[in-house]
């Protein structure tokens, strides 16, 4: 049983979800809001995040609630690697739509660690792939004419060496 006080979030689809405050404060948006406004006891609306995504975000925050807060010093080393720990890799084994919704929610809620894991997951999905393979992976239509594509390839030959 948790001894942390709880908060209630209301998802964009109107579902109330109870969350331990220490878990909720993995979100800098929520942490700063609570510091500025205090605890009102009312449900906190999370207008950009539906129930399924919010539950996934809370699951990640619960697993990482004891992680040290990230500092500015971590930023450079964090960005230089696409390594993801095993639990996070399993957590991110979701369909593409859910993956992108988690990334958007992490950005909106200002949860840097989760945003990093989501972005690294996408980076690993495209690493070493050709533009055609990337388009296929993400179901992206090619809007270049063959002439434009040839010109781009010629201009960027140096990148393929």
From Swiss-Prot:
GO terms for biological process: exit from mitosis; G1/S transition of mitotic cell cycle; G2/M transition of mitotic cell cycle; kinetochore assembly; mitotic nuclear membrane biogenesis; negative regulation of cytoplasmic translation; negative regulation of mitotic metaphase/anaphase transition; positive regulation of D-glucose transmembrane transport. SMART domains: Skp1 (SM00512). One of its GO terms (cellular component) is RAVE complex. Residues 103-161 are annotated as: Interaction with the F-box domain of F-box proteins. Coiled coil: none annotated. Pfam families: Skp1, Skp1_POZ. The keyword Ligase does not apply. One of its GO terms (molecular function) is ubiquitin protein ligase activity. PANTHER family: SKP1 (PTHR11165). Essential component of the SCF (SKP1-CUL1-F-box protein) E3 ubiquitin ligase complexes, which mediate the ubiquitination and subsequent proteasomal degradation of target proteins. Controls sulfur metabolite repression, probably by mediating the inactivation or degradation of the metR transcription factor. Component of the SCF (SKP1-CUL1-F-box protein) E3 ubiquitin ligase complexes. This is E3 ubiquitin ligase complex SCF subunit sconC. It comes from Aspergillus terreus (strain NIH 2624 / FGSC A1156).
